[in-house]
Amino acid sequence: MAASRKGKAVKAVKQEDLRRLMQETRRDSGRQKRVESPFARYSGAGQLMCALCDAPVKNALLWQTHVLGKQHKDKLQELKSRTAPAHTPAPAHTPAHTPAAASSSSSTLKRAAEPPPAPGKRAKLQTGAGAGLGLLAGHYDDDDDDEGGAGERKTAPPTDSALPADFFDSGPAPAPPISHSGSVSKAEQQESQEPPENRPESLPEGFFDDPVRDAQVRQVDTPKDQLEREWEEFQKEMRQVNSASDAIVAEDDEEGRLERQMDEIEEQMQCLRRVEELRAKQETARSRRRSQRREEEPMQEEEPLEEEEELMHILTQDWRAKGALA
């Protein structure tokens, strides 16, 4: 009875509970190793996803492998190419030349080049302008008046005219801004640029016998530098491939370890079930033996009584008589 109670007390854990516990432990370990990246995001169920590629990633160990993949690199390059034109400054478009603007600019330049007139010439110009205005107004005099007026005009100081006092003193008017169209500016830029035939890059490869000098003149890497750069790129690619393979191997090892643990748990559960079956069989065998013993005990008690009665009957008879022991 004590063994049966002990067997009932040891209960086997259900397989579903063990699977649930294993999933919770895996989920907790995944939560602890969160990926810190602007493109990494987690769903409501805790699944790691790439926001740039919109693709799920199994776990944090494979995030570096996904980042080094071709799909992620192409998406990142496409994003950079889309965002780059937004920051480039737009070329300034200026209006084209007009004939009126060209003529006005040439006249202002000529006026600026001429020397300022002398004071005597300035007075003569002022008096001449005043006389012209008087004739236009209709003031006509005789010849004598003209002569006397001429003498008086020679001695009289110059009077104010219709022109402003600082007409000739003021400098030349500022030239209007000359506008250029986009095509003109482009043409000027093309003229300012050096023609391709005069550039060092236009020289053919192997123009100089010395490969180092040839590379320096053409402003390219020397063969040694090129080999070193290619070697560094090769090593970088190999490191990336090795890191990706290490991540895959680590993931495979983790999955294999979890599978082995699940197999061991299932094997333990089968062993527990077998132990329980054997204990149940043992209990049934014991109960049968007890019942058989209980049935055999009264029969064993009756047999000694019969033997004693026969012995007493024999002893009471005359053993010397004929046929007494028959």
UniProtKB/Swiss-Prot annotation:
Disordered as annotated region, ranges: 1-37, 83-214, 237-257, 276-309
Biased composition annotated in UniProt, kind: Basic and acidic residues: 13-36, 276-286
Residue stretches of biased makeup (Basic residues): 1-11
Zinc finger feature spans (C2H2-type): 50-72
InterPro entries given in the database record: Matrin/U1-like-C_Znf_C2H2, ZNF830-like, Znf_C2H2_jaz, Znf_C2H2_sf
Biased composition (Low complexity): 83-108
Ranges in a coiled coil: 224-295
Keyword Zinc-finger: yes
Protein role: May act as an important regulator of the cell cycle that participates in the maintenance of genome integrity.
Protein known as: Zinc finger protein 830
Native species: Danio rerio
Taxonomy of the source species: Eukaryota, Metazoa, Chordata, Craniata, Vertebrata
